[in-house]
């Protein structure tokens, strides 16, 4: 079965082995593709790779929180929390002009 997912429906993507799980408000979809593929094909103004295993839709971000001493997590509007690496946090700050 083929599901058409519009960019605005995409909340975030998470890597798991050779697959990427795409999260939308309506459910999860697994795609046999690499994170690098999505990173290069999704619009950089809208999607940021915040961790080696996670790409997030910046329009879905509610806030960025300090998690522990030097770690950050990204809280989405739907309540999901995603860990951000230090490099991912810096990239997110640049893209959001923080």
Residue ranges and their predicted role:
Residues 1-83:
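Conserved binding/recognition cores within well-folded domains
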Residues 76, 88-98:
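Eukaryotic intrinsically disordered, low-complexity regulatory linkers and tails enriched in Ser/Thr/Pro
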